[in-house]
Structures are given as structure tokens and as C-alpha cells.
């Protein structure tokens, strides 16, 4: 889509479609569910060298299609969604969630990533502003590996112009995680908090996947 609005794709229209395809409403947390005890925050991880140094013309939350193009990116279509919460279990509204990742051939949208085969139809970066219940949503591709790294998606969360978290998420159960030096140093708790299940969505013609990852950040000044 030819728009840089973080709320470009209507969140609820997409979620209603997914619910209709057999996904339960339990994919989202009830606000304050864990408010009686502090939650473990999503562990901070390196931003890495490939945060886009030149933003694409399109920075919305649909990474599969750039601008008015009718040619989608190559890869397993994945719907990544979840809730941004603070450690009290309270939803964080108006949080800017950014993601960036390699395309199907393992190449980033970055001028210094000169490996061949970058998918010109893959946006490579997207952003979304959480709603009043702290929810976010992206349509992207299932992450793939490249030399030295297990498949992963980078994420950053910013609240009122303050970067609250920089992290990464991984495919739960992927054997390549065991050899990834960043994943290994997270420890068991950190690994659990950043491992995401990519589950097939019944009824989709292209075998689309649903991935739910709740992101826990530290307290903001308002908290």
C-alpha cells in the first residue's frame, strides 16, 4: 500500500478474517491478566547492523506488498500479532512497534547487505501503532535463515519517542536456534519469551501462518 501511516491496514478486519478461519479469541491477553505479579520482560537483544539505513517508500504493516504493486513478496505468508504489555500486565496503547527482517533469500533492506538475491517486492520493514488495548498486527513472511543466524524477526518498541525495547523473536522448535549465538545467550527463560509458534491457518489457499507474540516492556513514566 502506498502509505506510511502505521495504522494503514485495518487491524480488526484482518483479525475477524483470521477468527473466521478457525483461530480462537484466546490469541489475545485479557488486560491486567497478570497484574497481581510482575511479568518477566521481553529480553533486550542487539539491534544488529541492518536496521534500515534508508526507509522504503512504504512503511506500513503489510510487508508483502509495496505501494501499488500487484506482485507480492516471495515466502510463507505469516500474520504476526500480539499485545504490548508492561510488566504489570497492563496494555500499552499508542506504542510504535517496528519490525525488520530478511526476505526469502536471506537479504536485508540495507545498503551494506550486498548479498545477491534480495526480493525487490518484499518491504523488509514495517511499523504499527498499538490500539487502545495494546494490540499490534503485521502481515509478513515467515523468517528464514542466513549465514550465522537462525531465522528471526527484529522488533523495536517506542513509547512517546523513547525506545523502550529492542529485541528479536524466533521460530519455536527450530533446530537452528541451538546454534545461534544470540539465542543461546538468552537462557531458558529468555528463549521461551522470544520463541513464537507459526501455526497453519485452516482454509487458506496459500497455507498462511498465524504467529502470536506478546511483547512485555518495562514501565513507562506514566505507569
What are these regions (language model features)?
Residues 24-25, 89:
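Generic hydrophobic alpha-helical segments
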Residues 4-6, 10, 20, 218-223:
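Peripheral, solvent-exposed domain-edge segments
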Residues 1-12, 25-27:
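N-terminal secretory signal peptides
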Residues 21-22, 77:
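Membrane-topology and secretion signals of cell-surface/extracellular proteins
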Residues 36-197, 204-223:
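Beta-strand-dominated extracellular/periplasmic modules and repeats
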